[in-house]
Regions:
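Serine-hydrolase catalytic machinery in alpha/beta-hydrolase-like enzymes
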Residues: 2, 27-138, 236-250
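Short, proline-enriched alpha-helix->beta-strand connector loops that line the catalytic pocket
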Residues: 183-188, 218-220
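Short beta-strand/loop motif that positions the catalytic acidic residue
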Residues: 184, 190-192, 226
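Acidic catalytic loop of the alpha/beta-hydrolase fold
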Residues: 195-205, 231-232
Length: 275
């Protein structure tokens, strides 16, 4: 998949340590879970001839938001984001689909391996099933958001999943092989860091290319670029900051984070309504 190749090519410039993946298998999810993990309800969703786990937090009957993982998997940071989303305004029901089927990376090499092996078309089907589950279980409207790999999938869902009512994507764009953003059906808001070095995937050039495609689509859209910010700038927990620094990403900008969340809130409130 071209989206994965773009991200992997840029990630090859990051510092790597040999991962235990290649000798002893993945670490269990608990190794990455925060204390907040207990707030989630674990549910199994069936699509076609397979099932997958999702993690749900927030008020029943509230508008829903499907929250898509970074290339690490369903770790503490995507759970932090989902909890935050569930508490915005009058509240949302946030749902994280486990696209990696229980695997979580602890090192960049693991994340590369997992993302390279992702069935991207299958992930789109997981997203569609997640959106449908929320709508069938009390959410009148459902949006999709995602980060890095999940950001690319979020944009793709706005093209390929007709049940999606709104999208907010963070630092990720899909390849034309996965989804042509000029054919978007849902309103899309996207956020990028000015200093993002993931060329062709999340850098300024990719952001501007996405904006041109969204203009051509005719859907409501916004593309925001944050000065002085690099990749994954929304990740602000102590654990995430340590991990970012290990990847050479040393910027911290709480003002940009607050502004992005404010824009997220306004966008989802506009298209999903309030609980």
């Amino acid at each position: 998949m071209a989206t994965a190749r773009l991200l992997l090519r840029s990630a090859s410039l990051l510092p790597l340590r040999r991962s235990p993946l290649h000798s002893s298998g993945f670490q269990p999810r608990a190794a990455m879970a925060s204390d907040a993990a207990s707030q989630f309800q674990k549910i199994q969703i069936q699509r076609e001839d397979t099932t997958f786990d999702v993690y749900v937090v927030g008020k029943e009957n509230a508008p829903g938001v499907v929250v898509l993982q970074e290339w690490w998997g369903v770790d503490y940071e995507v759970k932090n984001h989902a909890i935050h989303i569930s508490q915005i305004g009058d509240g949302y029901r946030a749902l994280i689909p486990d696209l990696y089927r229980g695997k979580v990376a602890l090192e960049v090499a693991e994340a590369q391996h997992l993302m390279e092996g992702l069935d991207w078309q299958g992930a789109i089907k997981d997203i569609q099933a997640s959106v449908k589950w929320l709508k069938e279980n009390g959410s009148p409207k459902v949006g999709v958001t995602g980060y890095c790999m999940g950001g690319a999938l979020a944009v793709a869902s706005g093209v390929l999943v007709p049940e999606v009512d709104a999208v907010v994507a963070f630092y990720g764009t899909p390849s034309s092989e996965l989804a042509d953003a000029s054919k978007a059906q849902a309103p899309i808001q996207a956020h990028f860091g000015e200093l993002d070095s993931f060329v062709g995937f999340a850098d300024v050039t990719a952001a501007k290319s996405l904006e041109e495609k969204l203009k051509a689509s005719g859907v409501a859209h916004e593309v925001h670029i944050y000065s002085g910010c690099s990749h994954a700038f929304m990740n602000a927990s102590p654990e995430a900051l340590k991990r970012r620094k290990g990847m050479g990403l040393t910027d911290e900008n709480q003002g940009a984070i607050d502004l992005a969340w404010s824009r997220f809130s306004t966008w989802m409130g506009r298209f999903l309504g309030s609980a």
